[in-house]
Amino acid sequence: SLFELGKMILQETGKNPAKSYGAYGCNCGVLGRGKPKDATDRCCYVHKCCYKKLTGCNPKKDRYSYSWKDKTIVCGENNPCLKELCECDKAVAICLRENLGTYNKKYRYHLKPFCKKADDC
């Protein structure tokens, strides 16, 4: 769910997920999809593509369990869809951390109508 995703992003990046990524670029946040503006936005684009591959669960609502061991996210689910959902969220949180160096505040509240159409996943 959005709750676990937000928690993972906070743990990996140290940033407030809603404030820092809720409307970042063309792909971060609930709305929008478009050609990524930078590496951070690309993380969100790949994350949305990951969600598209899921079948049998709702990425925004379904809860899953994970643990934080030695600063590492460990997904712990028996349900295959919830396990994949957790892995999608883990991947974006790590990607956002790996691209903190190029995070650009000018894209924090980017207007989605200015986004160009993205390639298909």
Swiss-Prot record:
One of its GO terms (biological process) is lipid catabolic process. InterPro entries: PLipase_A2, PLipase_A2_Asp_AS, PLipase_A2_dom, PLipase_A2_dom_sf, PLipase_A2_His_AS. Coiled coil: none annotated. Keywords: Disulfide bond, Myotoxin, Secreted, Toxin. Residues 105-117 are annotated as: Important for membrane-damaging activities in eukaryotes and bacteria. Expressed by the venom gland. One of its GO terms (molecular function) is phospholipid binding. It comes from the Eukaryota. The keyword Secreted applies. It is found in: Secreted. The keyword Secreted applies. One of its GO terms (cellular component) is extracellular region. Disulfide bonds join 26-115, 28-44, 43-95, 49-121, 50-88, 57-81, 75-86. CDD domains: PLA2c. Snake venom phospholipase A2 (PLA2) homolog that lacks enzymatic activity. Shows myotoxic activity and edema-inducing activities in vivo. A model of myotoxic mechanism has been proposed: an apo Lys49-PLA2 is activated by the entrance of a hydrophobic molecule (e.g. fatty acid) at the hydrophobic channel of the protein leading to a reorientation of a monomer. Homodimer; non-covalently linked. PANTHER family: PHOSPHOLIPASE A2 FAMILY MEMBER, PHOSPHOLIPASE A2, MEMBRANE ASSOCIATED. Belongs to the phospholipase A2 family. Group II subfamily. K49 sub-subfamily. This is Basic phospholipase A2 homolog piratoxin-2.
